[in-house]
Amino acid sequence: MLERLSGQTRLTALLAAPARHSLSPKMHNAAYAKLGLDYAYLAFEVDNSGLAAAVQGMRALGICGANVSMPNKQAIVPLLDELSPAAALAGAVNTVVNTDGKGHLVGHITDGTGAIRSLAEEGVAIKDQIITIAGAGGAGTAIAVQLGLDGAKEIRLFNRKTATFKQAKQVLKGINAKTSALASLQDLADDRAFRRSIAESSIYIDATGVGMKPLEEHSLITDPALIRPDLVVFDLVYHPAETKLLAFAREHGAKKVMNGLGMLLYQGAEAFKLMTGEDMPVAYIRELLCRDKE
């Protein structure tokens, strides 16, 4: 990487805590090298206490873009100059672009577009469909927003009654006001409503994190009757590559089972495009990530 750095090198970054585990530096720097772009991507350990200073640093240093992850996705919103329509609806940001290089910072959310591009890659259409999502955290609500913007018929979100539940209610109000979709939020503890919703949906998305460590032996769906030959099951977890849910859905004849690797790649590709104006070489990056996991 050092031989690529110059006095003209443009800096992109990750603002997160923790940041060390992220695959984003590997993805973006590999893409820069592949395309011969004079950019470098660094991960910075930044939590809410240092976020305002980090954003000022972006302006002062002319950092051309940054990815934003936990715990900063919502906290960064009031620090920016402008939001994309999806970010405004979601009330959260995962990508910031310094649009003029002079400090005008625009926030975007690419989780939803990443998920929908991943579905499209597998031939799964979302227009006019009923979709159930378990988990109303940042990823779940971002996907709900993009589903609404892209023409889903109904979006049924389920979550435990925590602080996240209250926040998600506000997001869904925006979806109902700004899109043609009918968005609803119900308690994940209401098993009857959850089962009925899955039975009426063509796509089930699990955005809870159940299935990754330390919950790798768990699944929200354990009844074979909920798995139908016309149901797509999409788990946002990508490590392990096949969660308990996906193995169960495959075994019992789901139409299609998908993990979160495609979403990871495509949300990164959307951010890459926003920050550089270039298309990320997705096939190359996918191969690189899969090879590293072997």
Curated annotation (Swiss-Prot):
One of its GO terms (biological process) is aromatic amino acid family biosynthetic process. The keyword NADP applies. GO terms for molecular function: shikimate 3-dehydrogenase (NADP+) activity. It comes from the Bacteria. It is an enzyme of class 1 (oxidoreductase). The active site is at K73 (proton acceptor). Its EC number is 1.1.1.25. HAMAP family: Shikimate_DH_AroE (MF_00222). Involved in the biosynthesis of the chorismate, which leads to the biosynthesis of aromatic amino acids. Catalyzes the reversible NADPH linked reduction of 3-dehydroshikimate (DHSA) to yield shikimate (SA). Belongs to the shikimate dehydrogenase family. Homodimer. This is Shikimate dehydrogenase (NADP(+)). The lineage of its organism: Bacteria, Bacillati, Bacillota, Bacilli, Lactobacillales. The gene is aroE.
